C-alpha cells in the first residue's frame, strides 16, 4: 500500500493539521515508511502465541473499594475565593 500526496493532504485535513505543499513529500515518505513497517509486522507468524497486555509478567493486586473524599477537601476549597459547605461558589453566567 502506498500513500499519495492527495491522501497526505486528506489525512492532514481530517487531523486539522496545516500542511504546506513543501511538507507533503516528506510526510508522504514518512507515512509510506510507517505502512511498510506495519506490512512487515503482518508477516510475523503468531500462531500459538498467547495475547499479552504487558511484556513483563505481573498481577494486579486487588484491594477493597472504599469510598473516601481523598482527605484533602479542605485544602482544595481553600484555594477558592468563595465557598459554601465545601462547594465552590461561582458567578451565574447563564440567565
UniProtKB/Swiss-Prot annotation:
One of its GO terms (biological process) is glutaminyl-tRNAGln biosynthesis via transamidation. It catalyses: L-glutamyl-tRNA(Gln) + L-glutamine + ATP + H2O = L-glutaminyl-tRNA(Gln) + L-glutamate + ADP + phosphate + H(+); L-aspartyl-tRNA(Asn) + L-glutamine + ATP + H2O = L-asparaginyl-tRNA(Asn) + L-glutamate + ADP + phosphate + 2 H(+). Keywords: ATP-binding, Ligase, Nucleotide-binding, Protein biosynthesis. Signal peptide: none annotated. Its EC number is 6.3.5.-. Disulfide bonds: none annotated. The keyword Metal-binding does not apply. One of its GO terms (molecular function) is ATP binding. Gene3D superfamilies: Glu-tRNAGln amidotransferase C subunit, N-terminal domain. The keyword Ligase applies. It comes from the Bacteria. Belongs to the GatC family. PANTHER family: GLUTAMYL-TRNA(GLN) AMIDOTRANSFERASE SUBUNIT C, MITOCHONDRIAL. Allows the formation of correctly charged Asn-tRNA(Asn) or Gln-tRNA(Gln) through the transamidation of misacylated Asp-tRNA(Asn) or Glu-tRNA(Gln) in organisms which lack either or both of asparaginyl-tRNA or glutaminyl-tRNA synthetases. The reaction takes place in the presence of glutamine and ATP through an activated phospho-Asp-tRNA(Asn) or phospho-Glu-tRNA(Gln). Heterotrimer of A, B and C subunits. This is Aspartyl/glutamyl-tRNA(Asn/Gln) amidotransferase subunit C. It comes from Nitrobacter winogradskyi (strain ATCC 25391 / DSM 10237 / CIP 104748 / NCIMB 11846 / Nb-255).
Amino acid at each position: 500500500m502506498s500513500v499519495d500526496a492527495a491522501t497526505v493532504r486528506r489525512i492532514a485535513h481530517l487531523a486539522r493539521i496545516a500542511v504546506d505543499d513543501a511538507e507533503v513529500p516528506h510526510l508522504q515518505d514518512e507515512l509510506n515508511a510507517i505502512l511498510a513497517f506495519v506490512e512487515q509486522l503482518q508477516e510475523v507468524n503468531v500462531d500459538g502465541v498467547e495475547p499479552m497486555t504487558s511484556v513483563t509478567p505481573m498481577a494486579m493486586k486487588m484491594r477493597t473499594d472504599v469510598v473516601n473524599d481523598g482527605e484533602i477537601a479542605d485544602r482544595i476549597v481553600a484555594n477558592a475565593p468563595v465557598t459554601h459547605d465545601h462547594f465552590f461558589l461561582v458567578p451565574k453566567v447563564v440567565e
